[in-house]
């Protein structure tokens, strides 16, 4: 796990191969459903490197959007330069996931959705050239919180849920990147913000 995480961080902050971000060298497969619910929020986008010369499976980096659990969508994985910067290296497969928001369902539905997405991605790893033992989750704000929850709850059956057709597959992740996601919920609204998190 340590080696994989270090490798990811080096790619995030390297600059040698991260130019021309407007000309992606990856194929985007949109709106893949990771459950059989029919809910438009139960979808993800997949980013597959073009021109792969090696047949070995690649690590997967999963982006989880922020928005105080009240807003946001999977398009942020493409619109922000964060995930594309990593994928431009050609060393990773990427995914950006939707999850249900707090105006539709209450916690822990959001982590159920994220875990269902991880199970689906791992269940389809061979199809998309993903190494099922090297899955990292990366999120900002509320997405950072959900990434952290994925990292610490792999043995917690109460947070697993039963969504999707891969309930027998592990939702464990090997690396977590929490980008300013909250951990002290009783304190986070003590600081100025455009969003009232307590309303989520």
Where in the sequence are the language-model features?
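Short amphipathic alpha-helix adjacent to the substrate-entry channel of hydrolases
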Residues: 75-95
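N-terminal cap/lid segment of alpha/beta-hydrolase-fold proteins
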Residues: 17-56
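Serine-hydrolase catalytic-loop signature spanning alpha/beta hydrolases and amidase-signature enzymes
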Residues: 68-71, 75, 94, 120
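Short beta-to-alpha linker loops that shape the active-site pocket of alpha/beta-hydrolase fold enzymes
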Residues: 50, 67, 93, 98-102, ...
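Short, solvent-exposed loop/turn and secondary-structure capping segments
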Residues: 57, 72-75, 107, 149-150, ...
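A fold-wide structural signal in alpha/beta-hydrolase
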Residues: 60, 88-98, 136
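Short beta-strand element of the alpha/beta-hydrolase
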Residues: 56-68
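Primarily recognizes the serine-hydrolase "nucleophile elbow" in alpha/beta-hydrolase
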Residues: 116-192
């Amino acid at each position: 796990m340590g080696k994989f995480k270090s490798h990811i961080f080096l790619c995030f902050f390297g600059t040698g191969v991260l130019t021309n971000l407007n000309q992606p060298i990856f194929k985007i497969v949109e709106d893949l459903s990771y459950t059989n619910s029919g809910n438009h929020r139960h979808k993800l986008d997949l980013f597959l490197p073009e021109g792969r010369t090696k047949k070995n499976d690649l690590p997967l980096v999963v982006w989880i959007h922020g928005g105080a659990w009240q807003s946001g969508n999977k398009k942020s994985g493409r619109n922000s330069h964060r995930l594309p910067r990593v994928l431009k290296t050609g060393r990773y497969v990427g995914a950006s996931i939707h999850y249900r928001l707090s105006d539709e369902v209450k916690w822990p539905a959001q982590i159920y959705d994220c875990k269902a997405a991880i199970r689906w991605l791992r269940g389809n790893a061979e199809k998309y050239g993903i190494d099922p033992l090297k899955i990292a989750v990366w999120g900002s704000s509320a997405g950072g919180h959900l990434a952290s929850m994925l990292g610490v709850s792999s043995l917690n059956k109460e947070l697993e849920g039963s969504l999707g057709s891969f309930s027998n597959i592990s939702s464990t992740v090997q690396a977590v990147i929490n980008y300013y996601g909250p951990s002290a919920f009783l304190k986070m609204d003590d600081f100025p913000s455009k969003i009232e998190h307590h309303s989520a």
